[in-house]
């Protein structure tokens, strides 16, 4: 599983010791196509890494059917907002194809903060960069719709 973390941008530069610490309580699961991994509105404190397959991120809107916000594949991740805020899920994650995911509970990230604060800071900076990239992409999509 450590090889998987090495491919995920938010874990870049953390080093082997920090990655091993994050993986201490990681869980791996196969998810059949069509199964929901995390549902919008649910309280769940896991970050998910996609080892194989394809995951659709869906958002419910009052006036329409769920909209696919993104389709993610191997090396991608979702659910990272639970590390930053203790709020219900903002979207639904559903397997678009048979997939294998690894879940990391938020407690793993808190343990990293306690034991390796420098690496935790690197992780948060990487997350901020990724969220900034996603926000720029949304800005571009919004501008294109105007």
Cite the ranges covered by each PLM segment:
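Cytosolic regulatory regions built on CNB/CRP/Popeye-like sensor folds
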Residues: 1-146
């Amino acid at each position: 599983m450590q090889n998987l973390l090495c491919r995920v941008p938010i874990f870049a530069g953390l080093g082997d010791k920090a990655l091993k610490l994050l993986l201490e309580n990681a869980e791996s699961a196969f998810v059949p196509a069509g199964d929901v991994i995390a549902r919008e509105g649910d309280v769940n404190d896991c970050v998910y890494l996609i080892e194989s397959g394809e995951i659709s991120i869906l958002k419910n809107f009052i006036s329409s059917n769920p909209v696919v916000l993104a389709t993610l594949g191997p090396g991608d991740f979702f659910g990272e907002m639970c590390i930053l805020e203790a709020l219900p899920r903002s979207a639904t994650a559903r397997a678009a194809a048979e997939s294998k995911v690894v879940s990391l509970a938020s407690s793993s990230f808190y343990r990293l903060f306690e034991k390796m604060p420098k690496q935790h800071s690197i992780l948060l900076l990487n997350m901020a960069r990724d969220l900034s990239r996603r926000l720029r992409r949304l800005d571009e999509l919004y501008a294109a719709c105007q």
